[in-house]
């Protein structure tokens, strides 16, 4: 087990930090009215029982039978992560909240991935599953880490960091168009014995994001801004799902509605989806890979800094700041798009990403008719 980290806020030095701790950052937040209040120990017990027992019941009743791909697995470590007084909360309240959420996540992951139908190594995956995974894991031999990148979860910035660490870029702020293939080493390019060694001995991490927020980010970006996606996917979607347009040669694909996009997703096999909207568990297979750290998009800066500290990145290497043109997907935006969907589509969409919600402890969005009227 890695040593407990002290003084998280200290500046990085050239070598690996001796006072580090690995943890899974939970993205689920307690209600704002309780942020500064202590939580009774009995609540911890209750939530753990509900989370692990409820999901186990889902498995036993076959509610996840349609999800043939594996769900994430914890590496079994007891994990702590101290953020000091971030968000105005006292350290004690923040630590207790983190402890509760870590217990829920760890028990949930352990329960789901211990099921007999779940693979427990890269080599027990199907050929397609293993190909997808290995093509999404980036390797840095100098600092001995593996990073499973997830599109729409700051992966472009992480690729910049990897290029700086390898010497391909001078710094992360260089103003160039990101090439997502060059100067990067993918696990898929290595021999089986080289893959096994790195999976066993290297620090492994990934980052997650609220599933519907990630999906909306992909939809708005790819169909609103990227012409190649409009031509490749948009034209097909409109011809398939918009009445009277099946043979329309004038379709440009730049006006795909969210409902049309969702209909397309529901007809797609999750294992063959485009990586930008493929569920995270299909991309990174955390049941088959025991990740040492799972960071969250919601705490991107602090989680990224922790990773850089742990792998011993030089002090001048920092995680890039968000671009000035960045527009976050707000809670109101998610509410607007989801509530605009017919209830039938909504009921079918959420189960498509149910493992991303449950394993990474993201609460399902409230899409009841009463809530959507507000």
Question: What residue spans do the PLM features occupy?
Answer:
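Membrane-interface amphipathic segments in extracytoplasmic regions
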Residues: 2-374
